[in-house]
């Protein structure tokens, strides 16, 4: 039964993800910031959907941080530095089907604190 529950949760997250992606997209000056959360770490990237190119990315494994709130703050600070170096000040936040709570909310708030308008 446990496998069915996990499969259902993943199916529901993917449905939410598709609903969100149908409504938002990014461009070169206003990219989409996509977040992926695994059990161990976080991945965040800025995507230009018009050209289908990743403009900037930060991997939590390379920073040596975990997928918790403190790690989210560190990843957001590093990602904000990367975006500012590329002269990107505003973006669209794509939570990728995850609930805007906990780590995802801290990540978005930390990006805002570091000067990125979402």
Curated annotation (Swiss-Prot):
Keywords: Ribonucleoprotein, Ribosomal protein, RNA-binding, rRNA-binding. One of its GO terms (biological process) is translation. It comes from the Bacteria. The keyword Transferase does not apply. GO terms for cellular component: cytosolic large ribosomal subunit. SUPFAM superfamilies: Translational machinery components. GO terms for molecular function: 5S rRNA binding; structural constituent of ribosome. This is one of the proteins that bind and probably mediate the attachment of the 5S RNA into the large ribosomal subunit, where it forms part of the central protuberance. HAMAP family: Ribosomal_uL18_B. Belongs to the universal ribosomal protein uL18 family. Part of the 50S ribosomal subunit; part of the 5S rRNA/L5/L18/L25 subcomplex. Contacts the 5S and 23S rRNAs. This is Large ribosomal subunit protein uL18. The gene is rplR.
């Amino acid at each position: 039964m446990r496998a069915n529950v996990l499969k259902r949760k993943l199916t529901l997250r993917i449905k939410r993800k598709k609903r969100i992606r149908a409504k938002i997209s990014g461009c070169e000056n206003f990219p989409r910031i996509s977040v992926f959360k695994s059990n161990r770490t976080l991945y965040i990237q800025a995507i230009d959907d018009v050209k289908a190119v990743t403009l900037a990315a930060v991997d939590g494994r390379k920073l040596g941080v975990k997928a918790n709130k403190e790690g989210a703050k560190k990843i957001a600070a590093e990602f904000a530095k990367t975006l500012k170096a590329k002269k990107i000040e505003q973006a669209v936040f794509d939570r990728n089907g995850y609930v805007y709570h906990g780590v995802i909310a801290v990540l978005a708030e930390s990006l805002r604190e570091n000067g990125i308008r979402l």
